[in-house]
A protein has these predicted regions:
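Charged phosphate-binding loop/patch that engages nucleotide di/tri-phosphates or the phosphate backbone
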Residues: 115-145
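Divalent metal-dependent catalytic cores for phosphoryl transfer on phosphate-bearing substrates
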Residues: 1-107
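Long, amphipathic alpha-helical surface segments
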Residues: 102-120
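Generic detection of intrinsically disordered/low-complexity segments and helix-coil linkers/edges
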Residues: 1, 110, 126-129
Length: 145
């Protein structure tokens, strides 16, 4: 719950804000996803959050990453599929939550996200590619069972 409430806390906060004085943005991260990292920094250094699971759920809620924990997956999927989103196949992806495992939903959502980004509609983050490759392997392994 804490991660869900705080995941976008730094979304509109400039990197020059006093609350982010010690924050160093990671390399190779497009501007639209920087807030996930600055948000985790803000949660830890301003609000005193120490729970690694909460911090990771904030830190990777936009890009994903390989081998995410349950809280990370839930925040990622909730953020991507929230009621205010309106993009092709969003209803189908939401239905996945009721019908499939979190890992399968991660695979499908990351696949959609990569297609969108590769079509030139946004900057691609290496973490998203790594996350997709990880969940694609799980998807393939589950299909062979």
């Amino acid at each position: 719950v804490q991660a869900a409430a705080m995941h976008d806390a730094a979304k509109n906060l400039p990197l020059t804000a006093p609350e982010l004085a010690g924050f160093t943005p990671p390399e190779e991260v497009p501007a639209p996803v920087l807030h996930q990292f600055s948000g985790a920094y803000l949660a830890e250094h301003t609000f005193g959050v120490q729970d690694a699971e909460v911090l990771d759920a904030i830190r990777y809620h936009t890009t994903g990453r390989p081998n995410m924990g349950t809280a990370e997956k839930i925040v990622f999927l909730a953020d991507m599929l929230e009621a205010g989103r309106d993009f092709p196949h969003v209803k189908k992806l939401r239905a996945c939550l009721a019908e499939e495992s979190l890992d399968e939903c991660m695979y499908r959502c990351l696949k959609h996200q990569l297609r969108y980004l590769k079509a030139g509609r946004g900057a691609l983050c290496p973490l998203t590619v790594q996350a997709y490759e990880y969940y694609a392997r799980l998807h393939g392994a589950n299909k062979r069972k």
